[in-house]
Amino acid sequence: MTTREYDYIICGAGSAGNVLATRLTEDPDVTVLLLEAGGPDYRFDFRTQMPAALAYPLQGRRYNWAYETDPEPHMDNRRMECGRGKGLGGSSLINGMCYIRGNALDYDNWSTHKGLENWTYLDCLPYFKKAETRDVGPNDYHGGSGPVSVTTSKPGVNPLFEAMVDAGVQAGYPRTDDLNGYQQEGFGPMDRTVTPKGRRASTARGYLDQAKVRPNLEIVTHALADRILFDGKRASGVTYLRGSERATAHARREVLVCSGAIASPQLLQRSGVGPGAWLKELDIPVVLDLPGVGQNLQDHLEMYIQYECKEPVSLYPALKWWNQPKIGLEWMLNGTGLGASNHFEAGGFIRTRDDDPWPNIQYHFLPVAINYNGSNAIEMHGFQAHVGSMRSPSRGRVKLRSRDPNDHPSILFNYMAEALDWREFRDAIRATREIMRQPALDRYRGRELNPGADCKSDKELDAFVRARAETAFHPSCSCKMGYDDMAVVDEEGRVHGLDGLRVVDASIMPIITTGNLNAPTIMIAEKIADKIRGRQPLARVDVPYFVANGAPARNVAKAVRQPETV
């Protein structure tokens, strides 16, 4: 057994862990050990580096933990996919590369919780900007010198993107030029974490590339954290496995858990921090009975509303193996072409009811009919909208199955457990159909493939959701930040009741944000990094942002085609 000592030990080299490793080692006298259970982010592997290949990492286990849920009771008892990234970059190595920060009111809502007053949108915005380099340059809402490369949608891409945005506007919803700027609500182009050379902009590329040469950072891959060690109530180190070899590292200052919304509560529970009754079931000595560890689990659920495309402009030919060598060669040599995009270049956020204070539904538009993980491709030209609700009231949990770090935990999201979930998904399907029947899509829109034009009643729509809805791969909130009885960490990520231990990743969100989670997770890590370093927080950015204040969710009077009656 080997033993080493560092100032900080970080468990997990993902969207948050790489940020902390980079920022903490900017201080040359601070030593950091970064542990990652997966391997390197091999830059020659097109599966993780080519944006268009985003489905491939989800189809294996080299880069994907490939978790599976317990039977979901409201989803026909299906065991559902829960992919999480494994390797330097974590889930930023296998995600869909959509750069969505969330709605300003997400953070303003967090700040209404006791003790979280410094998590308003205007407090968070400087850290979003700090992390970002946007290809069209900085402005009041965007950064120009950060580690994360953000690419905007360019004119001349697939005509279906513009048509779908125009259709949303024709249906009476707003147009927005920037889903991460003044107004998230509406339809418009989508920013993506892609480099100017057409490569995936993971946190391994953006952050670790600048930090890994520092002598005060040690990165150990294929290192599976087993347990956090404690000296009384103070975290003192970590034991981890590399193959059959066990090693121990000691932390002079802090242990930072950045393993994500599934593995962070799993590691805490295995270390004796969690609901006491759960730990005793597995004969784990209780360091601290902390009931919220693994509770409050949230995710985004989504459906694919698919249509036949009457004109041959979809990405369907690119799915054929005989066309892929040319696409790959152009990407490899020039960083251009179909391989250089994730093809989520347009989307939007809407409110389905006037009394929704901010958007409750997200759209990703895709010019092909296929599942996110690359399965169930429709054998024809087609297009689809990925549609899902943003802030489900349903809550799940992550619970340890055994003390073996190689065993996956029991995961139950408890999808669709509340009446509001069903109302929002029915609303989403019907709103999508109204968008798709607008004139902008007339030349492209063929028959509805899924759910199918005959699927109309509440009962039929509900059956479709139960059978076909899938995860958007956004698990979060399982070690929530706050000060109520179920909170796990305080406003700086420090675990309640313990010293020298923080959790910093998407698991500490008190409520899931409106949109994809990579950008908010990076922001959280940037913000807490300043706290760890004892630095003054960045000054608030005093910019305006859109608030609906009860305005109609949709201007039906301006809709080009009025709603159909059901």
Curated annotation (Swiss-Prot):
Gene3D superfamilies: FAD/NAD(P)-binding domain, Glucose Oxidase, domain 3
Enzyme class, spelled out: oxidoreductase
Domain of life: Bacteria
Keyword Protease appears in the UniProt entry: no
Catalytic activity: choline + A = betaine aldehyde + AH2; betaine aldehyde + NAD(+) + H2O = glycine betaine + NADH + 2 H(+)
Annotated region (Disordered), positions in chain: 180-202
Required cofactor(s): FAD
Pfam annotation, one family: GMC_oxred_C
Gene Ontology CC entries for this record: membrane
Signal peptide start and end residues: none
Enzyme Commission number: 1.1.99.1, 1.2.1.8
Pathway: Amine and polyamine biosynthesis; betaine biosynthesis via choline pathway; betaine aldehyde from choline (cytochrome c reductase route): step 1/1
Catalytic center residues: H474 (proton acceptor)
Residues annotated to bind FAD: 7-36
Gene Ontology terms, MF aspect: betaine-aldehyde dehydrogenase (NAD+) activity; choline dehydrogenase activity; flavin adenine dinucleotide binding
Keywords on record: FAD, Flavoprotein, NAD, Oxidoreductase
One GO term (biological process): glycine betaine biosynthetic process from choline
UniProt family annotation: Belongs to the GMC oxidoreductase family.
PANTHER family: CHOLINE DEHYDROGENASE, MITOCHONDRIAL, GLUCOSE-METHANOL-CHOLINE GMC OXIDOREDUCTASE
Protein's job: Involved in the biosynthesis of the osmoprotectant glycine betaine. Catalyzes the oxidation of choline to betaine aldehyde and betaine aldehyde to glycine betaine at the same rate.
The protein, known as: Oxygen-dependent choline dehydrogenase
Organism: Burkholderia orbicola (strain MC0-3)
Organism taxonomic ancestry: Bacteria, Pseudomonadati, Pseudomonadota, Betaproteobacteria, Burkholderiales
